[in-house]
């Protein structure tokens, strides 16, 4: 009887290690298929946190690379994968954003704490002089009153190095209309590149408006009170509800020339 009990304990211990992997994070990169070797080196030479591995033990770790989509379309394909496969976090990494070597370590800390649902890295425009893609307000240029190492609260973040919690993207997915993207794939319009043309009835003047999918998404979160309805009531009360961690300082590379910004 004692021997049988001992064997039973061994079996239980062995089976415990074989339980289903947690679908912790999915990394999505929208790309046309060509990336710089500098990007690939930074992406695949990342320091991997313990027990946080694509081949590994208890935490699932997946990658998806939607090819030949427009940016917003690709982002919606990535979100669809995250929703359908039940991932806890989405990490958008664009194919011209070069991560620091410790990026996954930084992300892992936010994932473990789980107290901030939207976290962006810091990177700059591909221009000279360059400006940080950090925003407080609309129509008033960038926000640059920070030093490297600061954690900056903002109301607008880019999607080139962006971590999003499931509570946010799942709620938005559930409430977004379906539409068909390239290759007849049906997704939902969580992200959208705003572009519209209309005629002012008073002046009979034709007007147009356009923007980027990242700021449009940030505006939608605030306009539709997504944070509050997803359970982030304290953050929802903040004027600037999204975090930019400048420790996650990335380079923005020109795929054609290899120039990296900022250049100084």
PLM feature spans:
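Short, high-confidence coil segments that cap the C-terminus of an alpha-helix
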Residues: 87, 114-116, 240
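Conserved catalytic core of nucleotide-sugar-dependent glycosyltransferases
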Residues: 79, 100-193
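N-proximal low-complexity "stem/linker" segments adjacent to membrane-targeting elements
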Residues: 1-65
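C-terminal catalytic/acceptor-binding lobe
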Residues: 2-15, 20-21, 178-264
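Active-site nucleotide-sugar/metal-binding loop of Leloir-type enzymes
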Residues: 77-89
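Short beta-strand-to-loop acidic/aromatic patch adjacent to the donor-nucleotide binding site
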Residues: 87-98
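Conserved acidic residues
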Residues: 60, 88-90, 117
């Amino acid at each position: 009887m004692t021997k049988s009990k001992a064997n039973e304990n061994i079996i239980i211990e062995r089976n415990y290690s074989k339980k289903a992997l947690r679908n912790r994070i999915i990394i999505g990169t929208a790309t046309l298929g060509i990336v710089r070797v500098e990007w690939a080196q930074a992406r695949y030479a990342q320091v991997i946190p313990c027990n946080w591995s694509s081949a590994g033990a208890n935490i699932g770790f997946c990658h998806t690379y939607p090819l030949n989509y427009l940016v917003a379309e690709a982002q919606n394909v990535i979100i669809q994968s995250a929703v359908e496969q039940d991932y806890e976090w989405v990490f958008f990494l664009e194919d011209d954003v070069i991560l620091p070597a410790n990026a996954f370590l930084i992300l892992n800390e936010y994932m473990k704490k789980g107290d901030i649902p939207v976290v962006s890295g810091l990177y700059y425009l591909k221009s000279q002089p360059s400006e940080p893609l950090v925003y407080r307000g609309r129509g008033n240029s960038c926000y640059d009153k920070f030093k490297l190492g600061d954690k900056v609260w903002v109301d607008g973040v880019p999607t080139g190095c962006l971590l999003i919690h499931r509570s946010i993207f799942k709620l938005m997915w559930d409430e977004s209309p379906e539409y068909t993207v390239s290759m007849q794939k049906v997704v939902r319009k969580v992200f959208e590149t705003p572009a519209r043309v209309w005629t002012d009835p008073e002046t009979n003047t034709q007007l147009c408006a356009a923007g980027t999918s990242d700021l449009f998404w940030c505006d939608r979160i605030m306009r539709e009170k997504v944070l509050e309805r997803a359970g982030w009531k304290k953050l929802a009360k903040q004027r600037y509800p999204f975090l930019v961690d400048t420790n996650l300082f990335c380079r923005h590379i020109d795929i054609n020339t290899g120039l990296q910004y900022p250049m100084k």
